[in-house]
């Protein structure tokens, strides 16, 4: 009788069950190793992402500071009160809150509003510092500062600068369509522009300029009421008037800070943080 040929399995000294167990253990080890390597890779990616986020945050901070500084320089060239832009930001934030806007948007608006006149950096000093009436041509050039401001900051993908560009372009629009540079009217004017229009008007007329003295606060409040529905959005005016006492207190506080800071520190620090 011829002996039956043995298969490789018959020649393997390791019992089938034990062999299967070893294969499973090896597979589990390889899986564990792969999992560890994947976790390490994820950890490295997380570190890289954190470093990237920090770098982006730093760049955005420097970018914001550069634009704030540019707004300050435009303000100084125009002969504005040293904290004009900071006050505009503070008033705008208060008005937005009175309108029921979110705290996040109010904070964003407060920062963005401070760059409303950044476009004046592109207007010649002879026009900005002129004490007499502007000629027709000078006035035409002056009315370009909203477009200039929007061109400077409006192309950014950062929310603060996007809103600042929107404000720069629209804060001289009138509710009745008689403003500039686009001739927008009503709700076609972005809310931020409608808010800053009131804040800017109030602050500009309650502080001295090279060509006129400041008007009494209550006189300016009456002027804003008279322009309700014409130059200014009725709802924004109503919101402003509902917090008029708070606006007055904020103005007085910032005027005092301006006086103290100007006497002791100068204007080279974080001036926009005094609000």
Over which residues does each language-model region extend?
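Metal-dependent catalytic cores of enzymes that make or break cyclic nucleotides
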Residues: 3-8, 29, 36, 43, ...
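Amphipathic alpha-helical coiled-coil "transmission" helices that mediate dimerization
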Residues: 7-61, 65
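Short FAD-binding loop at a beta-strand-to-alpha-helix junction that anchors the flavin cofactor
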Residues: 68
């Amino acid at each position: 009788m011829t002996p039956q040929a043995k298969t490789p399995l018959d020649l393997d000294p390791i019992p089938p069950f034990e062999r299967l167990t070893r294969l499973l253990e090896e597979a589990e080890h390889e899986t564990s190793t792969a999992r560890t390597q994947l976790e390490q890779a994820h950890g490295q990616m997380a570190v890289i992402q954190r470093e990237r986020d920090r770098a982006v945050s730093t760049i955005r901070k420097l970018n914001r500071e550069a634009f704030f500084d540019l707004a300050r320089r435009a303000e100084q060239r125009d002969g504005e009160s040293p904290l004009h832009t900071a006050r505009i930001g503070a008033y705008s934030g208060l008005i937005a809150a009175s309108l029921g806007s979110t705290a996040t948007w109010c904070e964003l608006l407060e920062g963005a509003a401070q760059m409303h006149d950044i476009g004046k950096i592109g207007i010649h000093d002879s026009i900005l510092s002129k004490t007499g009436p502007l000629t027709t041509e000078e006035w035409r050039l002056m009315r370009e500062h909203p477009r200039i401001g929007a061109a400077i900051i409006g192309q950014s993908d950062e929310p603060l600068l996007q809103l600042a560009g929107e404000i720069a372009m629209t804060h001289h629009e009138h509710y009745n369509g008689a403003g500039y540079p686009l001739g927008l009217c009503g709700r076609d004017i972005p809310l931020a522009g409608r808010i800053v229009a009131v804040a800017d008007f109030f602050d500009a007329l309650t502080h001295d300029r090279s060509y006129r003295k400041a008007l009494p606060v209550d006189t300016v409040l009456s002027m804003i009421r008279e322009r309700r529905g014409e130059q200014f959005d009725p709802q924004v005016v109503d919101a402003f008037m509902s917090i008029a006492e708070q606006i007055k207190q904020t103005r007085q506080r910032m005027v005092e800070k301006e006086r103290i800071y100007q006497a002791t520190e100068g204007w080279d620090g974080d001036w926009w943080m005094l609000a």
